[in-house]
Amino acid sequence: MDKDTKTESYPVRLGDFIYLFSDGYGRVNYNVEITYGDTTVTFEDFPELSEEISNYDNCIVTSAHVDDCWLCVHVEDSKYCSESHSVRVGDLLNLFSNKGILNFSVELNDFDAIADFEVPVELSKYISRYFDCVCRSCYWEDGCLCIFVKELYEN
């Protein structure tokens, strides 16, 4: 598939993913559970990004969910994705989806405009217009994934 095709999905590094859920100063806003194959490691008390959690930065996130105050991610090893890069809305939401459906609400916000999507959110519907927007930060609140984006625009 051509790199300019808007529907192409790109891998998301764990380091870039976790940073979206941090306070911007190096502390993750959630406890973190990382599952890698048959191994699960946990980081409690809202870990610092520079601590042991950084050992997993270059792993690729294959799926994610939020459970209470835990950010739970499944990862796989990646030898080709060692550079940090921006995370697009579409790539982030694909990690949380179950066969293209999200069982929570989504709010996209660029501080000037807001786009809300109520449960169930189908990734192939209206929200797909915003898939190429670049994420700045995220947080989970009352069953809604709130995503701040650099600029809210439609593809």
Residue ranges and their predicted role:
Residues S22-D23, S97:
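Short conserved AdoMet
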Residues M1-S9, D77-E83, E151-N155:
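Short intrinsically disordered terminal tails
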Residues D4-T7, V32, L95, K99, ...:
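N-terminal cationic leader/targeting segments used for protein routing and processing
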Residues Y10, H85, G100:
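Flexible coil/turn residues that form the inter-helical turn or adjacent wing/linker of helix-turn-helix
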Residues G26-E83, I101-V149:
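Acidic, low-complexity, intrinsically disordered interaction modules
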